[in-house]
């Protein structure tokens, strides 16, 4: 009996000394990215995520498979070191009908054809429209994916900057069976035209 009392007393002391952690406030990092030498992160808590709005797609998932085509959609909300939201990085990656996306260590190609204009397209339609464009306008049997970088300030700022399509590669390198997350990396650049900004983007992701 005395032993049981001692054990219970010890547990009370241990519990009272532990810092209480609210599950809603646990941080999750989905993406870290360097844009022109500056570091950004898509990191959030469950509490913050519940209140966030304005994602390019009508879901808060960072990666999800389309229902009507063979497209994997990707979206990240990138903030600076002070937590200020600065960019959205979003788009889609096509994959084969028999492919179990994503395949580890496969380089998924991202390329925006110069003739494809995204200026008048809703964000959530860009990836689908680009897949259709490639089917109609190019002879490639293996369509490329597309990722777009968009300044968050565009929504509230009078100085509008066009969303910028990027080209490069994205690769998934690891799958964690415990938390069902895929890890990977990407390297992206835009095709600079007259008067446009040049972007060099690279980073890592952890998604499920």
Question: Would you name each region that the model predicts?
Answer:
Residues 14-17:
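C-terminal motif of bacterial Sec signal peptides marking the signal peptidase cleavage site
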Residues 167-208:
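C-terminal or internal capping secondary-structure element at the end of a domain, subdomain, or sheet
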Residues 19-26:
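Bacterial lipoprotein signal-peptidase II cleavage site
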Residues 1-2, 19:
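N-terminal hydrophobic targeting signals that begin at the initiator methionine
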Residues 31, 49-174:
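Surface-exposed helix/loop patches within compact recognition domains
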Residues 28-44:
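Post-signal peptide N-terminal segment of mature Sec-exported envelope proteins
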């Amino acid at each position: 009996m005395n032993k049981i009392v001692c054990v219970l007393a010890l547990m009370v002391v241990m519990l009272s000394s532990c810092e209480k952690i609210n599950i809603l406030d646990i941080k999750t990092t989905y993406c870290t990215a360097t844009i022109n030498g500056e570091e950004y992160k898509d990191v959030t808590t469950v509490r913050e995520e519940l209140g966030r709005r304005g994602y390019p797609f009508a879901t808060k998932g960072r990666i999800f498979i389309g229902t009507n085509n063979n497209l994997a959609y990707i979206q990240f909300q990138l903030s600076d070191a002070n937590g200020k939201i600065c960019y959205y990085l979003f788009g889609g990656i096509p994959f084969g009908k028999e492919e179990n996306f994503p395949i580890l260590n496969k380089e998924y190609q991202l390329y925006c054809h110069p003739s494809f204009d995204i200026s008048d397209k809703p964000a959530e339609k860009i990836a689908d429209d680009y897949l259709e464009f490639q089917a109609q306008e190019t002879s490639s049997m293996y369509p490329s994916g597309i990722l777009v970088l968009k300044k968050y300030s565009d929504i509230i700022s009078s100085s509008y900057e066009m969303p910028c399509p990027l080209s490069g590669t994205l690769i998934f390198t690891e799958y964690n069976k415990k938390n069902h997350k895929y890890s990977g990396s990407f390297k992206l650049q835009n095709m600079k035209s007259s008067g446009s900004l040049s972007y060099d983007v690279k980073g890592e992701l952890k998604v499920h």
